[in-house]
């Protein structure tokens, strides 16, 4: 009993004991990471006849039917799936002849007896080797059906394992459906014998036993029988198809016979019906008979063609079937030959397999013997040293080994030869397999061909059915046509003969009908001719008399008019005569002449009236004697000469006025320069006012200190204060009133000037933006207008071209009409000449074809041109409407702009007036200052007397002034905030206005553009004037600053003159020197100890911090706030601690200096961070002039003062260095060198450091300007890109318009092509109809010549009348053809897109019928 392990790589033969592992000595070597060196062992148990698998306690264990096993022995059954390790290959146990005792559930089905050829037999006893799939018979020989009912039953309990443990493995109870594997009679290929071999197995792994058993032979015979049955099925199918084809051929023949019979019956009926009509020469019946004959011929041709095609296809199918039969027989023969070859090859293979197995057994025996001999040699080698005789034995053994090795080499060479032969056999098998595949493909192709033939036969049957349906329809149409003809004939008889029949017994023939119609038409013609002659005779006599009388009247009046025109007459005389001419009662023939003469006279009358009006307008009175057109012209010439002389005088006056204007302009410029100087003075006054406000703010702190001092002084010396109170009160009131008035005036002026400046700046910005927008809009409008002009020019060119084409077409139509007239004349001449009728008729027909075609083309083109003209007119109207609407909109906008410009001019005028007022006010102030200077020398003595009373007075004044200034500052800040809100609102309004203006771009006309350009020029002039005014204002501010400096110098001189005679001057020199050294500039921020002042300072600093740029501006703001809070806390502590008067005074003076220094440092830092920020005002802070200073100050206080000053300097410098570092890091400036502190430096070094800091500031300014320029460039680039985008959008719109126009033109071209095709078809039809008419005319002529005598013809009617009738009928025919052709063209236009050609054919057929009904009247 042989067993195998089946895997994807092939088959492995199991020995009685097979070792599995990674080691090289193991039987089945598996080299993977999951497998141990000695993994497992499979042994055959002869007692039970089963295989047992034992795991050697491997790391990952083994899996039997996906059940994990480790250090356990398990019995195996055929079909068990094994896997060694967790991720190894799967193996299936396959046993050739399982023992029935040990494994009753694996028992296969009993072999089928011989008389059952169609059922599967028992599994064969074929020996398997590497590469063979050991499957059961149900797998190898099945044909797509599931296994029989004798497959293994439901799951069962496995027997006990070798180690005494029980393991149950579940089998799949469902029998799998096995696919068809058999392809040929051979059992050796990969698909014919095994169903489990993978596609990757090479064919070199197939081996067979030497002798086949009887079962195998029976199975092969059964398979061959199945193939024979399959081929017989194919034969039956082919016979069935042959029978079907024969039946179809018979049906086709029957159908063809029926068709021929029906056609013969229809022809007989039509001949029976048409015999009496042919005797009466009915042209319509002849046409129908011809059409029916043509249809018959077409049907016969189709039948013949169809029968021929059927016969050809049947013959081809017969030949194909015969060839297929022959091929099937050849295949059977080849199959028999190949089956014999396969059996012989199988026998050879089995014999060679047995030889190989014998050789393998011998090799195994030799291996065992070699092992035994090796053991013996080892024993001998141990004894070798002792006995020399054993050496001889070893030599003999060596000789034997060499002989054995030679034998092994021979065996190996034989094995190689056998393998080569096996490969050759496999190649032959492959070739046979390929041939069988080719044969199967050919069979499939033949099946496909048969299916196609069946489909063709079905299609042809359907076509035959359609042909039958068409014949039925044709029959129905013929019957309807016959009925319509009969009805039409009856109606004609009723119309000609009336209700009573002339021959009651006999039917009316066609000849009688035709003769009656001819008589009726002749009577009508004669009657109409008589009518015309009588009417002409009656109308001619009275008309001639009337015309003669009216002509005489006209002549008389015209002579009068001529006499009047020759004489010098006025317009009134001419008018009277024209009215007489107009109201003359004349005949209608002469009325046209009358109208033309009246029009000519009216033109001359209008000229005369206009000249008289001109003379009347010029106040030139004409006398009664002076009349006539020539005299009026002479008067006009004289007046013109007078006017020319007056115009020359006026030009001289204009030149003089221009010179005066130039002088006035120069004066105006001089006045403007004066105004500029005044503005400079105003600016100086502003600076002075700012200095005063700063002084007040600086003195507020000293005022608070002086309050406390004054209270102490009042307690000590109340008597002195009571005496001086009255004097102080009077002085206070006077000073307060004067200061309050000055403050109010200055505030109002400052506010007015600020507002003016802001308004001017806003107006300038608005005007600049408006001008930019206007220029941009103008450019856009120019582009759009140019495009519209081009379009209009294109349209005009097209219109002119179309007009030219229309004129050409009209000329062609006139030519064609002339040709038609000529053709009619030629027809009348041709009718007189009977011999040349046929030739001339043909020439006329050709000419008529050409004329008809040209007329139709011209008509269609005229219609198209009319439509286009209408569309263009509509588009032009729409464009005009749009332009008018745009004009109205632009006019409204222009009026708005004009109003704005007027408002701006009014504001400028008002500003100039205010400037004049301000200059006058400043002049008054200058006068007061000069008076004060003159009066300085006088009150020096009074000042020396009032020294004692001075300090308290000054302190009270300062307190009041500081309170007023604080209130003013608060009010100014509130007003500034409100103005900022207004400015933001105005900016939003400006943005909305810009958006509206951008919407209106591209909609302006040329006139509006011109107006906008004028307005832009005006705006530019105004902006230039404003810039000039600003320059003048700047000059005035410069002058004002100079005057402020002079005032400061004068005030210092006054103070010095007042302070010289005071006794305590020596004591006050030290703080003064200190204050003079620290001349500090800072913003107006009152250093009041109250909470309101601190809040105001914090708010101003926070505003500055928001404005400053950089990533670390918040940190700097926080640092500044902390420093200010520390300073304030220290100031308050010092104020509380120091109670003594002298100490208080010293500390307060020093604190003032320290706070001023700290604020100066803070201000410098803020200026470094944001130098563009505008400061409200700068003041010089000086120590209080009248504060008492004690000479007995101690050294301790001086030390404390020095330490405080050093701390303040350190804080300020830290803030400065931090700010410089942040700016340098943000701006990427590496050359910042002013990082040293000023604490321990000498004055010279401090100057150097200050110089370096200024350089750093210049670098920062340069960097900021560079960034600004870059931003401006980027903005300009963005604007350019936006303009390009808008241009692209406009170009896209124009491209879309052009595309639509191109599409329209293409549609027009297609329409013209379709119309040409329709016209060609109509021409072809008319040609056919004309040829038919010629034939009918010839037949009629022959019949008349045969049936009628020449005498009767001369008696019945004259040839001249016949010619007239023929001519009229011919014209009617031409008209009817034209109408029908136009109807057909319309119908084809509607149906060409849908592709329905049948309707057009039917219409053509109907048109021919209508023409045939008209034709009988036109016989010769």
Curated annotation (Swiss-Prot):
Intracellular or extracellular location(s): Cell projection, Cilium, Flagellum
SUPFAM superfamilies: SMAD/FHA domain
Gene3D superfamilies: 1.20.5.1700, 2.60.200.20
GO cellular component: sperm flagellum
Tissues expressed in: Highly expressed in the testis (at protein level).
Keywords from the UniProt entry: Cell projection, Cilium, Coiled coil, Differentiation, Flagellum, Meiosis, Spermatogenesis
InterPro entries per the UniProt record, alphabetical: CC-FHA_domain, FHA_dom, SMAD_FHA_dom_sf
Positions of the FHA domain: 18-69
Biased composition (Basic and acidic residues): 1053-1071, 1340-1352, 1395-1405
Entry protein name: Forkhead-associated domain-containing protein 1
Species of origin: Mus musculus (Mouse)
Gene: Fhad1
């Amino acid at each position: 009993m042989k067993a195998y392990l089946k895997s994807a790589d092939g088959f492995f033969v199991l020995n009685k004991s097979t070792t599995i592992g990674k080691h090289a000595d193991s039987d089945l070597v598996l080299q993977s990471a999951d497998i141990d060196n000695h993994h497992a062992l499979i042994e055959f148990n002869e007692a039970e006849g089963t295989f047992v698998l034992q795991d050697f306690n491997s790391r990952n264990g083994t899996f039997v039917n996906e059940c994990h096993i480790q250090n356990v022995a398990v019995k195996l059954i055929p079909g068990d799936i094994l896997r060694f390790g967790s991720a190894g290959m799967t193996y299936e146990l396959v046993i050739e002849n399982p023992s029935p005792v040990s494994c009753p559930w694996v028992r296969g089905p009993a072999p089928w007896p011989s008389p059952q050829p169609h059922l599967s037999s028992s599994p064969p006893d074929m020996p398997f080797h590497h590469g063979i799939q050991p499957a059961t018979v149900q797998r190898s020989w099945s044909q797509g059906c599931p296994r029989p009912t004798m497959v293994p039953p439901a799951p069962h309990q496995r027997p006990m394992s070798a180690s005494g443990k029980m393991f149950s493995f579940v089998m799949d109870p469902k029998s799998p459906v096995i696919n068809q594997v058999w392809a040929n009679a051979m059992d050796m290929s990969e698909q014919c014998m095994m169903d489990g071999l993978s596609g990757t197995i090479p064919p070199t792994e197939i081996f067979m036993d030497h002798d086949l058993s009887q079962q195998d032979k029976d199975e092969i015979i059964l398979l061959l029988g199945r193939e024979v049955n399959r081929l017989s099925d194919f034969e039956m199918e082919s016979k069935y198809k042959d029978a079907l084809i024969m039946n179809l051929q018979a049906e086709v023949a029957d159908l063809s016979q029926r068709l021929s019979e029906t056609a013969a019956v229809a022809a007989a009926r039509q001949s029976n019906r048409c015999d009496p009509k042919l005797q009466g020469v009915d042209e319509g019946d002849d046409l129908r008979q011809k059409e029916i004959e043509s249809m018959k011929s077409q049907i016969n041709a189709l039948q013949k063609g169809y029968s021929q095609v059927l016969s050809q296809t049947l013959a081809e199918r017969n030949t194909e079937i015969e060839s297929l039969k022959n091929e099937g027989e050849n295949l059977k023969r080849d199959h028999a030959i190949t089956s014999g070859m396969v059996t012989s090859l199988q026998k050879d293979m089995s014999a060679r397999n047995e030889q190989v197995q014998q050789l393998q057994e011998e090799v195994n025996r030799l291996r065992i013997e070699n092992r035994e001999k090796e053991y013996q040699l080892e024993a001998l080698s141990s004894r070798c040293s002792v006995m020399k005789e054993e050496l001889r034995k070893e030599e003999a053994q060596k000789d034997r080994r060499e002989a054995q090795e030679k034998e092994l080499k021979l065996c190996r060479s034989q094995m190689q030869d056998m393998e080569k032969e096996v490969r050759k056999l496999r190649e032959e098998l492959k070739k046979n397999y390929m041939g069988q595949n080719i044969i199967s493909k050919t069979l499939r192709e033949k099946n496909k061909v048969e299916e196609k033939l069946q489909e063709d036969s079905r299609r042809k049957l359907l076509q035959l059915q359609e042909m039958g349906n068409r014949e039925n329809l044709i029959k129905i149409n013929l019957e309807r046509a016959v009925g319509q003809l009969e009805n039409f004939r009856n109606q004609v008889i009723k119309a000609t003969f009336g209700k009573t029949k002339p021959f009651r017994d006999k039917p009316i023939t066609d000849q009688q009908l035709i003769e009656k119609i001819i008589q009726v038409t002749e009577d009508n013609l004669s009657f109409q001719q008589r009518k015309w002659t009588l009417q002409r005779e009656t109308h001619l006599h009275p008309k001639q008399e009337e015309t003669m009388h009216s002509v005489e009247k006209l002549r008389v009046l015209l002579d009068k008019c001529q006499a009047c025109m020759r004489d010098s007459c006025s317009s009134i005389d001419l008018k009277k005569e024209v009215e007489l001419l107009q109201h003359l009662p004349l005949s209608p023939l002469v009325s046209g002449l009358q109208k033309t003469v009246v029009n000519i006279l009216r033109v001359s009358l209008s000229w005369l009236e206009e000249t008289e009006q001109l003379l009347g307008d010029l106040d030139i009175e004409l006398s009664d004697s002076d009349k006539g057109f020539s005299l009026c012209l002479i008067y006009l010439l004289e007046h013109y000469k007078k006017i020319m002389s007056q115009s020359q005088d006026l030009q001289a006056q204009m030149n003089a006025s221009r010179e005066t204007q130039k002088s006035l302009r120069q004066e105006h410029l001089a006045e403007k320069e004066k105004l500029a100087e005044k503005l400079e003075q105003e600016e100086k006054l502003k600076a002075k006012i700012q200095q005063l406000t700063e002084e007040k703010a600086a003195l507020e702190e000293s005022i608070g200190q002086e309050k406390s001092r004054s209270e102490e002084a009042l307690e000590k010396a109340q008597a002195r204060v009571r005496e001086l109170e009255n004097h102080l009160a009077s002085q206070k009131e006077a000073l307060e009133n004067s200061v309050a008035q000055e403050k109010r005036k200055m505030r109002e002026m400052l506010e007015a000037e600020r507002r003016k400046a802001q308004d001017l700046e806003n107006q300038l910005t608005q005007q600049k933006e408006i001008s930019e927008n206007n220029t941009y809009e103008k450019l856009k409008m120019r582009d759009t207008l140019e495009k519209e002009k081009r379009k209009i020019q294109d349209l005009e060119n097209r219109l002119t071209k179309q007009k030219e084409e229309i004129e050409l077409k009209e000329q062609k139509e006139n030519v064609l009409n002339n040709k038609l007239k000529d053709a009619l004349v030629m027809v009348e001449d041709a009718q007189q000449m009977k011999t040349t009728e046929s030739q001339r008729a043909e020439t006329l027909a050709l000419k008529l074809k050409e004329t008809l075609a040209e007329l139709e083309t011209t008509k269609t083109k005229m219609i198209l041109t009319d439509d286009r003209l209408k569309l263009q007119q509509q588009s032009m109207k729409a464009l005009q409407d749009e332009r008018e609407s745009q004009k109205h909109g632009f006019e409204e906008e222009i009026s708005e702009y004009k109003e704005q410009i007027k408002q701006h001019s009014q504001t400028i005028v008002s500003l100039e007036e205010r400037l004049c007022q301000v200059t006058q006010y400043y002049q008054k102030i200058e006068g007061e200052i000069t008076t004060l200077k003159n009066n300085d020398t006088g009150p020096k003595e009074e000042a020396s007397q009032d020294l004692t009373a001075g300090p308290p007075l000054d302190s009270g004044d300062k307190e009041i002034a500081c309170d007023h200034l604080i209130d003013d500052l608060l009010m100014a800040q509130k007003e500034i905030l409100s103005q900022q809100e207004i400015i933001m609102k105005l900016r939003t309004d400006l943005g909305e206005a810009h958006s509206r203006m951008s919407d209106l771009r591209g909609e302006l006309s040329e006139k509006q553009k011109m107006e906008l350009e004028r307005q832009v020029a005006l705006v530019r002039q105004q902006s230039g004037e404003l810039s000039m005014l600003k320059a003048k204002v700047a000059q005035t501010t410069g002058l004002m600053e100079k005057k402020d400096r002079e005032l400061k110098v004068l005030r210092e001189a006054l103070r010095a003159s007042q302070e010289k005679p005071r006794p305590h001057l020596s004591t006050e020199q030290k703080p003064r020197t200190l204050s003079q050294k620290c001349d500090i500039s800072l913003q107006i921020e009152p250093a009041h100890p109250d909470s309101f002042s601190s809040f105001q300072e914090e708010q101003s600093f926070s505003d500055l911090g928001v404005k400053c740029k950089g990533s670390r501006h918040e940190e700097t703001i926080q640092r500044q706030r902390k420093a200010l809070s520390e300073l304030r806390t220290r100031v308050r502590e010092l104020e509380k601690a120091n109670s003594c008067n002298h100490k208080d005074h010293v500390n307060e003076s020093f604190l003032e200096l320290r706070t001023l220094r700290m604020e100066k440092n803070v201000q410098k830092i803020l200026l470094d961070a944001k130098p563009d920020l505008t400061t409200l005002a700068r003041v010089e802070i000086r120590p209080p002039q009248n504060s008492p200073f004690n000479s007995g100050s101690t050294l301790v206080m001086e030390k404390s003062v020095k330490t405080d000053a050093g701390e303040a300097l350190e804080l300020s410098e830290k803030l400065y260095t931090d700010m410089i570092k942040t700016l340098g890091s943000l701006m990427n400036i590496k050359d910042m060198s002013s990082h040293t502190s000023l604490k321990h430096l000498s004055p010279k070094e401090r100057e150097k450091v200050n110089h370096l800091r200024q350089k750093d500031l210049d670098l920062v300014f340069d960097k900021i300007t560079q960034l600004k320029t870059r931003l401006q460039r980027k903005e300009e680039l963005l604007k350019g890109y936006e303009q390009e985008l808008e241009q692209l959008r406009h170009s896209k719109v124009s491209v879309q318009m052009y595309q639509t126009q191109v599409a329209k033109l293409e549609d027009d071209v297609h329409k013209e092509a379709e119309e040409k095709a329709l016209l060609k078809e109509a021409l072809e039809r008319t040609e056919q109809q004309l040829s038919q008419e010629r034939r009918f005319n010839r037949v009629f002529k022959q019949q008349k010549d045969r049936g009628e005598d020449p005498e009767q013809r001369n008696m019945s009617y004259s040839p001249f009348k016949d010619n007239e009738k023929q001519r009229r009928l011919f014209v009617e025919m031409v008209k009817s053809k034209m109408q029908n052709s136009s109807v057909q063209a319309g119908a084809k236009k509607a149906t060409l897109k849908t592709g329905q050609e049948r309707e057009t054919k039917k219409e053509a057929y109907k048109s021919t019928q209508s023409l045939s009904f008209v034709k009988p009247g036109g016989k010769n």
